[in-house]
A protein has these predicted regions:
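Short beta-strand/loop segment that forms part of the nucleotide-sugar
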Residues: 31-40, 73-78
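Conserved nucleotide-sugar donor-binding catalytic segment
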Residues: 140-228
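Short aromatic/hydrophobic "clamp" motif used to bind/position activated sugar donors
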Residues: 98
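A conserved acidic beta->alpha catalytic loop
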Residues: 23, 38-48, 102
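Conserved donor NDP-sugar-binding/catalytic core segment of glycosyltransferases
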Residues: 110-144
Length: 307
């Protein structure tokens, strides 16, 4: 059995998934398999994946070895949003480690080799996994490199201690992710960030720091992305409220950041028209103190989402 599963949730990404596939074919270490979770695509994703393993009559689920020497597994599911793709992945992964590579991203040629070597040398039950870097298409790490003396870290500490604020790439122990999966969402809401599961695990276990490029992303920070997050706040308020509740309960969180989460929690509850907003929280004083700020934030979000 391989050490690593690379899993890719995809929805109508046939036009970018081939690039991800080619990067996996170029890997200098083939100690991995690729799991594709098709979230109800209506394009030719299934047929394209089938062609890579010479599957002539692809069913909803199939698997086979591609010419590059690694196993590809394909699972089709009804469209349900990103977190349901993660749920399906964790239910079907049986390797020691797993990492998500999005359908419009790709891996540098030696990424798997670096992951496997790092885990063989440093991995143990003490760690949740490995944290590495995302690079942009110009060859620069998002948010810069980690400090040279940072050998391990808790995920939340990167943000709280202002060590690294940009996206990173987490390679997780599968057994730990299975303990917190599935992530139960809300009917009609498809924007429940799978970081919800990651935070639960990484509040108790540190990550080994691998100061290397593990994923290349086409990262663009523009107005459309900003508007997109406001629309997500509007479209999935119960999901965001649940995430903020978790953030307030994380033992590694600080009062400052718990209060920030409380503000966002109030805002999400206002948008969701959730009358149980106070009774659901175990930090009632903090939430009550955040009410005026949360009300103001909800108004701002509603206005931003309309633009």
């Amino acid at each position: 059995m391989p050490t690593l599963t690379v899993f890719t949730p995809a929805y109508n990404r046939a036009h970018t998934l081939g690039r991800t596939y080619q990067s996996l074919c170029r890997q200098t270490c083939k100690d991995f398999c690729w799991l594709i979770i098709d979230d109800g695509s209506t394009d030719n994703t299934r047929q394209m994946v089938a062609s890579w393993i010479d599957e002539l009559m692809p069913a909803a689920d199939f698997a086979g070895q591609c010419d590059a020497g690694f196993i590809i597994r394909y699972i089709w599911k009804e469209n349900g949003g990103l977190h349901t793709g993660y749920n399906t992945a964790y239910a079907n992964i049986d390797t020691e480690l797993c990492v998500c590579i999005d359908s419009d991203d790709w891996m540098p040629d030696d990424a798997v080799e670096k992951i496997v070597q790092c885990w063989e040398e440093k991995g143990s039950s003490r760690y949740a996994g490995i944290i590495g870097l995302d690079f942009d298409t110009q060859g620069k790490p998002l948010g810069g490199f980690f400090p040279d003396n940072l050998l391990e870290t808790y995920f939340l500490d990167l943000y709280i201690d202002n060590i690294h604020r940009a996206d990173t790439k987490e390679v997780m122990r599968t057994d730990l992710m299975k303990q917190v999966a599935p992530q139960v969402g809300f009917e009609g809401e498809k924007n429940f960030n799978p970081v919800y599961m990651l935070l639960q695990v990484c509040d108790n276990y540190p990550l080994i720091v691998l100061n290397e490029n593990l994923c290349i992303v086409e990262y663009q920070q523009d107005d459309s992305m900003s508007r997109g997050i406001y629309r997500q706040y509007m479209n999935s308020p119960h999901s965001f409220a649940k995430l903020r509740l978790l953030e307030m309960n994380l033992k590694r969180n600080t009062f400052k950041h718990k209060f920030r989460s409380a503000i966002h929690y109030v805002s999400s509850c206002v948008i969701a028209q959730d009358k149980q907003w106070l009774s659901q929280s175990t930090h009632k004083v903090l939430v009550l103190a955040a009410v005026p700020f949360g009300l103001a934030l909800s108004i701002m979000i509603k206005n931003k989402a309309k633009k």
